[in-house]
Amino acid sequence: MTVCLRQSESVSDQSLRLDPYRSGLNLTTEFQQLATRQSALPVSQLVEQQTALSGPAGLFVKLSHQLRLYGRQAPSLEDLEWLRGRKRQSLAERAVQFALGQHCRRPEADNPFKGMLREDLCCIVFDDRSLHTLVERYAAREALRQHDSEYFVKLIATTRETVERRIVFHGLLEHFDRLLPIEKSIYPLHYRAVQQAHLDHEETLYGKLILDQPISALLNVHSPEWLLNNLSSFELSIDWERVGQVMTRNVR
């Protein structure tokens, strides 16, 4: 994902803090502890950490460059030498094979972190105290990007052949609420408030959605088309006379 606008260093944005009471979170102790530590840091420091890891001159780009040039002999793979235990060594080696395959230095290989919970992937990618090697963090980052990409593809599909956007704005808010503070730090200032305003407008037009499950959980079970076709089962109430009046004013 391309780095977005930086948050103002002088502004304290409460939306960066993790709210454990919002739906859709798979809160492990490790994830909560990481989120708590990051919440105590200023936004400017979080942005610096994000840039050092994922920026254009960050560790992941450096690793990719070395893998293309040197393959298995890349200097950034030296931390594998300190691993002990067959299980740890095996996982790291699978991550190496995946990364080498991505850079055409080996046949393509499966990502060993594919299918993990987003929160668990975040703990590997963004926790500097983690015992995982750089190449494992890289592979986990790729799994995280794939996870988010698949989610957004499904979310965008709910906007096809319909004028209303309640599902997509619910989904955008849900995704943002799941992010670690370091991930939120590169979003535009007041991003959440803007998306909430869009959702409020949509629900004024079409009625409030009452969801007993997160959008992500629904999209794991049902197709975007199914959600659109069954919106009425999630609607609290719709005053169609009022909707018609609002839409008439908008047309004018």
Where are these regions (language model features)?
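Type III/flagellar secretion export determinants
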Residues: M1-R252
